[in-house]
């Protein structure tokens, strides 16, 4: 069996995933080759898709380029994860919409209106009054697309809100209720092949964001029934093959969904939990390809 790993040009944390998938794949008789998405892997030519990749049984897609993902799927490559799931997770607002009306607790959330005019006028700021009225301060403003805590802001007053909005108004945004009980801490639940495999808690004493990319510390966390129940709702709703689900802690440690990561890093998870994530992932891939 042979497969392909695709990453974007900034390999970063994916270097560990490439190494571990290759190690565990070799043990299972799976050969992996790595390609960087530099814009040259596929195109539409003479009205048809042309892919400049070798034949492969599957692709481990560690990029968020939905266009390439959809092109590869249309060319009959099997992607882990599917393009639709990557898109649904990468867009935080789509994640919230998908989870609404499903018994999954989330922060109160408002989608920012898209802005196209060349000049920002006073009338374009009026909706911020309804954001303030609905959420109150402090509140959280997020870029819809982002990872490792980048583009997430804790906003304490109207002046900060207007300033941050002016800086970011030409990209999709969302505004959320601030969960004070979860300051600097969150829970990452890892899911493989539709099953919860473990969890670890992250701490950051210097910032309201707990993301490991912001130098948080972590420890293994024994999941209780409340978190497992919500995690399983997410598994069923999204038909999850692989994901890291991040929860905030509400009152009495109530699980509140923060986001779902389709390309979740797992280096820290393996170190903290001693769970062989790469092995479980490659076993899933092998089983699904042979089904």
For each feature predicted by the language model, list its residue ranges.
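Active-site nucleotide/adenylate-binding loops and adjacent lid/helix of ATP-dependent enzymes
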Residues: 3-8, 86-184, 225
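Conserved N-proximal alpha/beta basic substrate-recognition cap immediately N-terminal to
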Residues: 6-118
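Generic beta-strand structural signal
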Residues: 81, 191-192, 249
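Protein kinase-like catalytic core scaffold
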Residues: 139, 197-198, 243, 256-258
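Phosphate-binding site of ATP-dependent enzymes
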Residues: 148-234, 238
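A short beta-strand motif that forms the metal-chelation/ATP-contact edge
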Residues: 189-191, 253-268
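A long amphipathic alpha-helix within ATP-dependent nucleotide-binding catalytic cores
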Residues: 208-257, 279-291
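A short acidic/glycine-rich loop-to-helix N-cap element
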Residues: 268-274
